[in-house]
């Protein structure tokens, strides 16, 4: 058996590729959470939140990471002032009492080098519940315009708003809300 000296051991340690996690920050110009809800049994109404903050941490070698984001509910936009005021009110998003909602993953689910889902905790109206979200169109690479390295994906989930205490107008306004968060994030 051959002996390896301290110098040889150090050389092996430093020659081993080091894999570490990387953090990406949401681009607020392109990460605009939106939702859909059935209205009066006839139409699907859509709204969006114009202010959000978030980070994604990815370790591809270990197939680990997390995503965490905060949505500022006062940035709600329903497409018209009156409709926005109504949906912002007590009994619905109640933005004065609950100025934020958010998601924090407990774990990311990978297929190869692609994130396909996350399991975590969603908070709405001060109520936090487990929520598994789907991640579609996950990709990482240089932005073709500014050349900065980015990771992107579309986060989707459906919740029952009544489980978070938002019961006003059920069933006239559906209990199910579909959430869509197109995420564009740049490496820190």
Task: Locate predicted features.
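Bacterial N-terminal signal peptides that target proteins for export
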Residues: 1-6
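Repetitive helical segments and hydrophobic/amphipathic motifs
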Residues: 11-12
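N-terminal signal peptide c-region/cleavage motif recognized by signal peptidases
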Residues: 15-17
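Low-complexity, acidic/polar, glycine-enriched regions of mature
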Residues: 20-188
